[in-house]
């Protein structure tokens, strides 16, 4: 008799965004003539950069010829993309990596969810709260999160570090040792950031406590302020304590194309029960060679084009488009009297619900009365209760119309 992994049975019945989709579909069935504006799920709306499209066409033509055809590629990624990543994303910031420290993937979500494969199931975990649900759910699946505590919505083996308006959304350094800490900056869902001195405190904590930081930098391309780090490796010593995840999804509109990369420094080690230090780079490489067959050649050529002169200009234009949306939305929401956070160095706005409304109650009222979809903050963790997340990835006219509707509604 085959037995199931019963840790999966601990998970909530469905993923947050699936719940939202069900509620929206119910509304559409009962209100078929209403036009809904979706500012919930952080999916992009602008087309791929022209440079990337041209690179994909060229790659397709190569695969159509016997002389230039390619079959299986390296599990870690093609050298042409890895070299472009190192040259453009890290070298200008004084950060140096060898090609074997970069692992190309099919999107940051895969690796943030799979990185636990190389870590013991009984490591303690720390997360900022609210948080991207994948971090928690992937740890539940392997048994690392413990048991869900009724009433609190928290997992027993997870330390929650609240990020609220009371602490300016800056998590306090734990007063105890934690094995693994997840950090995402610019932050999803709050849209807030850490300065270099604030991030340095985390690196110092990790080095002092032998803690592994899993740093999600998927939104670094949206950073506008000079004092906000684009990479954790801008902090001295981070190579000894951190793995960084990057994505082309929001940088270049690759949400449907699927490509990102993970940085696992060779200096980074973790311990066995006997106290031996093991390079995580070696373990991750072994894991990838077994469970991953590499990202497609066509996709990687498109990602390489992101770093071309034309690609950089086109990407900047698209990012400016989304950040213009964020500015309009932030100003529009604040004009209605709502308290809004984020939207300056990130494409997310974290909105405090008025009159003490719960996240889901405000979500439903905004859907039914303004026909605008957001994401209930409580879906990102207990500290998200009383907030709702809006994204700036919509069409420009839709964002303006959404602000008009919300203003008239409130």
From Swiss-Prot:
Q: Which cofactor does it need?
A: pyridoxal 5'-phosphate
Residues annotated with N6-(pyridoxal phosphate)lysine modification:
250
Enzyme Commission number(s) = 2.6.1.83
Annotated substrate binding sites: 15, 42, 109, 132, 188, 293, 389
Q: Which residues bind pyridoxal 5'-phosphate?
A: 72, 108-109, 132, 188, 219, 247-249, 258, 293
Q: In which pathway does it act?
A: Amino-acid biosynthesis; L-lysine biosynthesis via DAP pathway; LL-2,6-diaminopimelate from (S)-tetrahydrodipicolinate (aminotransferase route): step 1/1
Secretion signal: which residues? none
> CDD domains under this entry?
AAT_like
EC class (word) = transferase
Keyword field contains Transferase: yes
Instruction: Please write the reaction equations for the catalytic activity of this protein.
Output: (2S,6S)-2,6-diaminopimelate + 2-oxoglutarate = (S)-2,3,4,5-tetrahydrodipicolinate + L-glutamate + H2O + H(+)
Q: Name one GO biological process term.
A: lysine biosynthetic process via diaminopimelate, diaminopimelate-aminotransferase pathway
Keyword list, A-Z: Aminotransferase, Pyridoxal phosphate, Transferase
Q: Which InterPro entries match?
A: Aminotransferase_I/II_large (IPR004839), DapL/ALD1 (IPR019942), PyrdxlP-dep_Trfase (IPR015424), PyrdxlP-dep_Trfase_major (IPR015421), PyrdxlP-dep_Trfase_small (IPR015422)
What is the documented function of this protein?
A: Involved in the synthesis of meso-diaminopimelate (m-DAP or DL-DAP), required for both lysine and peptidoglycan biosynthesis. Catalyzes the direct conversion of tetrahydrodipicolinate to LL-diaminopimelate.
Instruction: Give the family, as the similarity comment puts it.
Output: Belongs to the class-I pyridoxal-phosphate-dependent aminotransferase family. LL-diaminopimelate aminotransferase subfamily.
* Assembly behavior: Homodimer.
Checking PANTHER family in the record gives:
AMINOTRANSFERASE
Protein name stated in the entry: LL-diaminopimelate aminotransferase
Q: Please name the source species.
A: Bacteroides thetaiotaomicron (strain ATCC 29148 / DSM 2079 / JCM 5827 / CCUG 10774 / NCTC 10582 / VPI-5482 / E50)
């Amino acid at each position: 008799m085959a037995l199931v992994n019963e840790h999966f049975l601990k998970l909530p019945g469905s993923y947050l965004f699936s719940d939202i989709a069900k509620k929206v579909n119910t509304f559409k069935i009962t209100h078929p003539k209403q036009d809904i504006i979706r500012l919930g799920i952080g999916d992009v709306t602008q087309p791929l950069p022209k440079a990337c499209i041209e690179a994909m066409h060229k790659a397709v033509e190569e695969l159509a010829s016997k002389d230039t055809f390619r079959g299986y590629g390296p599990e870690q990624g093609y050298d042409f993309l890895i070299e472009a990543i190192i040259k453009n994303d890290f070298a200008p910031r004084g950060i140096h990596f060898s090609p074997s420290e970069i692992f190309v993937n099919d999107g940051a979500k895969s690796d943030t969810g799979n990185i636990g494969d190389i870590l013991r199931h009984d490591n303690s975990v720390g997360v900022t709260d609210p948080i991207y649900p994948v971090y928690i759910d992937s740890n539940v699946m392997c048994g690392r999160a413990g048991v869900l505590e009724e009433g609190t919505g928290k997992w027993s083996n997870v330390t929650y570090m609240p990020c609220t308006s009371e602490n300016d959304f800056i998590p306090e350094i734990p007063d105890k040792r934690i094995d693994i800490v997840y950090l995402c900056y610019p932050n999803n869902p709050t849209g807030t950031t850490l300065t270099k001195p604030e991030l340095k405190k985390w690196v110092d904590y990790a080095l002092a406590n032998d803690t592994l930081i899993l740093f999600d930098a998927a939104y670094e391309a949206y950073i506008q302020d000079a004092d906000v780090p684009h990479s954790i490796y801008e902090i001295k010593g981070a190579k000894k304590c951190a793995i960084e995840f990057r994505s082309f999804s929001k940088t270049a509109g690759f949400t449907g194309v699927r490509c990102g990369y993970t940085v696992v420094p060779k200096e980074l080690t973790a311990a066995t029960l006997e106290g031996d230090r093991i390079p995580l780079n070696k373990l991750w490489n072994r894991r990838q060679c077994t469970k991953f067959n590499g990202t497609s050649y066509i996709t990687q050529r498109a990602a390489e084009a992101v770093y071309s002169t034309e690609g950089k200009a086109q990407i900047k234009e698209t990012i400016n488009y989304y950040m213009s949306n964020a500015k309009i939305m932030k100003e529009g929401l604040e004009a209605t009297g709502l308290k809004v956070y984020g939207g300056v160095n990130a494409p997310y706005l974290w909105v405090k619900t008025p009159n003490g409304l719960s996240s889901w109650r405000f979500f439903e009222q905004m859907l039914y009365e303004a026909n605008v979809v957001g994401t209930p903050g409580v879906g990102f963790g207990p500290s998200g209760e009383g907030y709702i997340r809006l994204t700036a990835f919509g069409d420009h006219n839709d964002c303006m119309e959404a602000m008009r509707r919300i203003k008239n509604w409130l």
